[in-house]
Amino acid sequence: MSNKPLRIGIVAGELSGDTLGEGFIKAIKAVHPDAEFVGIGGPKMIALGCQSLFDMEELAVMGLVEVLGRLPRLLKVKAELVRYFTENPPDVFVGIDAPDFNLRLELDLKNAGIKTVHYVSPSVWAWRQKRIFKIAKATHLVLAFLPFEKAFYDKFNVPCEFIGHTLADAIPLESDKAPARELLGLEQDKQWLAVLPGSRGSELKMLSQPFIETCKKLQQAFPELGFVVALVNQKRREQFEQAWKEYAPELDFKLVDDTARNVITASDAVMLASGTVALECMLLKRPMVVGYRVNAVTAFLAKRLLKTQYVSLPNILADTELVKEYLQDDCTPDNLFGEVSRLLEGDNHQMLDKFTEMHHWIRKDADQQAANAVLKLIEK
């Protein structure tokens, strides 16, 4: 490599990507303090000197309708970035997550002779598996959080590096209930069930009723049990309060506008919607049950498109049903009540020991591994 400072093109599309970008930039700068980063970043990346050509908010659009409305602007941003990077070629381009935007950008840059990396594998192993060919065309390397993702890429001879999961690095191997309870103002000497009905409006719409009715049954069976609910923002809080009023106004829920992490840490067992939060719960070593419902159309499509036997990451990782999953018509108060009761009364050692083992599998200092893999690619 020449004496010129390293130049890395980088695009993060949302807050989670900004956090990954921050860790990656720190790890690169530890080896190359004068490295330059340019593209699109959030506040954390910008604080480390990343030059952001556009506001990250431009890319953080969810849902088909919103995306269609923003399409002309998104295409303009992409065209500007292609022009900028072809005129000022970086040593490598790293697209963090945001696959709909980044893979298209990576394809154009790869065709222009720039080395490209996609950081965070899309869920190709789970559905729309043909996307892997598009990913192969667009990238020189994929950085994957989970070992089964790398195994999938290997099957198709697509270069992929398993770097471990940043959450597994961030969460200690053991987590103590008492400080979390103190922080949330929960009584220390009673049992608590964490209730996590999801972060999206559509999830709360589907799950508030079965989750609240499950708590109603639990209250009768375990009069001393406390219920603590994690809600990501004011909108979700209002939505849950509405359902609470409707289905069980007599129940005493403790609502918390805090991260799921503190609420899970404070609890004895967890009832949750599927998603990254199931992985977090596994890493915090709390027994859990997964309940999930989607609308009929999505369910119909998922049945045909999903290629995995399970929906929650702990089960996919273990390749067995460690955690009970109640989906669609099985997501009933009776089923959830039965499993939560078992978790509260039973011995969960086997489940929790496996959680610890899996934590070790994916705890590899992902920031450092990502930096190493990218530096190796630059030197090729």
UniProtKB/Swiss-Prot annotation:
Keywords: Glycosyltransferase, Lipid A biosynthesis, Lipid biosynthesis, Lipid metabolism, Transferase. SUPFAM superfamilies: UDP-Glycosyltransferase/glycogen phosphorylase. Its EC number is 2.4.1.182. The keyword Lipid biosynthesis applies. InterPro entries: Glyco_trans_19. One of its GO terms (biological process) is lipid A biosynthetic process. GO terms for cellular component: membrane. It comes from the Bacteria. It catalyses: a lipid X + a UDP-2-N,3-O-bis[(3R)-3-hydroxyacyl]-alpha-D-glucosamine = a lipid A disaccharide + UDP + H(+). It is an enzyme of class 2 (transferase). Pathway: Bacterial outer membrane biogenesis; LPS lipid A biosynthesis. One of its GO terms (molecular function) is lipid-A-disaccharide synthase activity. HAMAP family: LpxB (MF_00392). Condensation of UDP-2,3-diacylglucosamine and 2,3-diacylglucosamine-1-phosphate to form lipid A disaccharide, a precursor of lipid A, a phosphorylated glycolipid that anchors the lipopolysaccharide to the outer membrane of the cell. Belongs to the LpxB family. This is Lipid-A-disaccharide synthase.
